[in-house]
């Protein structure tokens, strides 16, 4: 998301990262009077070099991402006694299968251990349970030319240093990492990695996130490789202020790039580091006809922890009064649509049974309309206790915007999905009238019927 970080602030942030790295290491050393509690371990016997992931089914009793001081237990993952990464059990009391990337491990016998990391855990979060460990093994290809798309994606997935001012604060943590495989016109192959964070402490305000993006998590592309003729010709990442930069930083566990979260809106640096690092295991997402937000639908817990962080940070209210506050995310209708904008922007109105007025995604604010093209989401706040069966219509409306343009139209408009979150934060898709794409001029509308009455 857009935010400004001046060069001085960036230098200060890097210095802060170094300071926190030293400070947190000192703190950890002060808490070693008792050996860390082992939760689980697994012996790996590899007949060849492998890229290894780990699935950990775990829970942390009596914790909640919403409760200050009891947010989560941290566990430390090591390979042959050496630090690999930390993992925060952000799903709390619920059993959840966390997947992490360990990196390339050489042929032979190895021990993977998961231990309680008390210094990194919340003050009132002191226990964790591990039901199972499962290794995820991928043959390590000797070079990019002979690797499959999956082998490439696994071998180059990034490890992320935590932003220093998030350590022990349980904010803006990475939840999921996915990758896309893109084939471009010049026959280049691009593998791009994107991470879903719980939220962003800087950048777009919460209500604007919901209106323009249909979520309050932060979703950022992190890193990508470009291949031509089977050879990697370029590695880039998203730098501070959304600048695309060439990756020249260090690597770990094979070819995995080390990047640090380096700004309040979760952009990255290949120079900084901190005392804590994460490596969510990447899964493939096919988003040619879907939004980035749709990956969250596969893991409903991400909606819950999104809401819990907002609750803890006092950004959820029964009566939102400013741009940084929203209602309970379960009180919104989430609309997934597609359009190609030319000097125009889209907004949506929702009509519900028994309500005289419609409810608008832009809340009457032109800056909350959607002016980007492609597939996108928005979220429309509805009255409390409205059920999916109460939703009658969704109206798309096109508006001219202030950007220079030879023509002003919303082209190829279509609403493709509508959903609401149930009480357990599970997305429930609403029946939606199927319509062909349409083009709208300024002030023109298109109505889509919702529900069984269509």
PLM region descriptions:
Residues 2-12:
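Bacterial N-terminal signal peptides that target proteins for export
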Residues 46-49, 78-82, 103-110, 182-189, ...:
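A short, structured loop/turn motif at beta-sheet edges
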Residues 141-151, 183-190, 196-207, 211-221, ...:
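Domain-length functional cores that host ligand/cofactor binding and catalytic or interaction surfaces
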Residues 50-54, 331-333:
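Structural beta-strand segments of beta-rich domains
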Residues 11-21:
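Bacterial N-terminal signal peptides
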